[in-house]
């Protein structure tokens, strides 16, 4: 096993311990991605579902590297989604993403090592992590060290968003302690095995010695029997009979004693060896019992260490749960406040809905009055036209009145002048009758009489004109003076033309008055007409003043309504801000209720539903605001128009009309009662 690929082979040995249907003994069998997908489905079936597993093509085992690459892409994407969505881990840039093309084409061991490292991270963070950790602990020490190093590299290259690390269940302290305890137990086991081996060797040696001693004893017995029955020595000399006191007997007796001593020594050695063998057997039994006890103690120690780790995790979880419980209590209080606030908002929204319904009913009712309003508009337009005609007539009558007054004054003056001229003519006629004059004098008197018959104003004008003509003839040298004189002359000509027009009008009026029989009645009629015109003028001025006051009141009402609308809009904005805050708090409460059990998909669904509710509430509130503003503006316009129509009708029903005209006019209606806004 090379040092460069030691981690890969360690991960492969761990992967071989998994119970999978697909072959997974070497890199070529892992390069198709089927075994990896089955392992992920075994680790987290809720994330790597059967439908996802069905997308992995098992036919990619052949030589089609493109199908294998597509399978590996699906596996890598699924692993990255599992890390980001379920475990809330983000892999940093120092951890290079496995190159699926290199794995599919060349079975690159380094890339496959990174992929197996990611799969190992999924295994130690799934729901069944305790069983997989126990399987890792049952491997060899070197494999465990390499797997631990792979997990540490994965932890250093990941950045977690929630509490805990990548290898939450295998903390460094607990795992190092477990490894130390396991190493000590293995050393004790090796020492006991060495002792057992040595005792077995000693037993074999003692058994061999025992067999050798038995063989020697058998030989000695045979030799003793031979020597006992043999009468000839080794050198061929006859030993003689064996009798007491004989040399042979003594020699045999001496040999027998020597043999007995040797036998006693061998028996003592045998007994010692037996005792030693029994002691060694008892020691071996004790050692085996001690080994069994140590094995049990190691198993119990591992179980106790697992329990200690579980208890530590449970204590950590308990502390976290206590902190979360305190936060949940605070959030529950806030949630109750939010519930109360939401109830108030719902009540207000219900009130707004009722107001909107009432406004809609009012709008339906007012739709029936649209025709009448249009008729009133037409009548108002006709009345305005009549008012314009009457105002023009009033102006004409005022002008005629002034003309008549000037005419009456001129007529009185002319009447006085005519009376004076009549008296003068009578005197002149009397003088002509009395005196006798010559024709020249008569002609002169005729010319003088014709001049006297002319009015004095005309004479003054003629004289003034003659003087101006003389001045003009004399001052022809200066053009500026001539221009000024021409302008003055033109102005005077225009003034004279106007005077001629007025004179002609007076002549026509005098002729009409002379034709009439009773001028006093006509003067009375003229005075009555003038009085009526003055009254109409006063009424029109009153109407204008009242319309001005109504306009000012309407402007005040409009400003008040605009201010109320602004305040309502500010209130609605404040309510929207509070509503958003409430929704955000509710989101946080929902997220923090059980973040370990609640999946990310449920949180996303909740956020989407909350966003949909916010959009619906915004659209409803905006629609209600538009409807309320439209109905309020429509009602304001209708009331203002009705007040204007009623005021004009009331003015038209004044003293300037007859009884029948008053009966023909429609009575003003009562103003509509506006609804009070809550």
UniProtKB/Swiss-Prot annotation:
It is found in: Cytoplasm, Cytoskeleton; Endosome; Synapse. Residues 1-155 are annotated as: Interaction with microtubules. The keyword Cytoplasm applies. GO terms for molecular function: dynein light intermediate chain binding; microtubule binding. One of its GO terms (biological process) is cytoplasmic microtubule organization. PROSITE patterns: CH. Keywords: Coiled coil, Cytoplasm, Cytoskeleton, Developmental protein, Endocytosis, Endosome, Microtubule, Synapse. It comes from the Eukaryota. Residues 135-435, 479-589 form a coiled coil. Signal peptide: none annotated. Transmembrane segments: none annotated. Its main location: cytoplasm. Residues 5-123 form the Calponin-homology (CH) domain. GO terms for cellular component: centrosome; endosome; microtubule; synapse. Involved in endocytic trafficking by stabilizing organelles of the endocytic pathway. Probably acts as a cytoskeletal linker protein required to tether endosome vesicles to the cytoskeleton. Involved in modulation of endocytosis at stages required for down-regulation of membrane proteins that control synapse size. Not involved in synaptic vesicle recycling. Required in R7 cells for boss endocytosis into multivesicular bodies (MVBs). Has a role in regulating adult longevity. Homodimer. Interacts with microtubules via its N-terminus. The coiled coil domain mediates homodimerization. Belongs to the hook family. This is Protein hook. The lineage of its organism: Eukaryota, Metazoa, Ecdysozoa, Arthropoda, Hexapoda. The gene is hook.
